[in-house]
């Protein structure tokens, strides 16, 4: 009787391990819909990244940001910045697609394309 019980425990344990292994082999499912948008150009400050401006064209249509901190720099200027060189950038706040400049600056830089 004990042999029969041991066999059942081993069999169930083996099947459970096999099930867990096969259940985790697939790619994780990503249920988020990113909407096929275009990424904004961002500038870093060593600890955080913020968008350069609050609007741009994506496939001919405007995309805007609202209610987040930004750098009051156009995407065109940000793209011309030399990667890794520190710049003084005006901080702002996105309001209806426009980066409203505040009264503070902070060091910002453009990262390399690999980042």
Swiss-Prot record:
One of its GO terms (cellular component) is extracellular region. Disulfide bonds join 38-58, 54-94, 70-99, 89-108. Glycans are attached at residues 45, 72, 103. It comes from the Eukaryota. It is found in: Secreted. Its main location: secreted. Keywords: Disulfide bond, Glycoprotein, Secreted, Signal. The keyword Secreted applies. InterPro entries: EVA_Class_A (IPR045797). This is Evasin P1182. It comes from Amblyomma maculatum. The lineage of its organism: Eukaryota, Metazoa, Ecdysozoa, Arthropoda, Chelicerata.
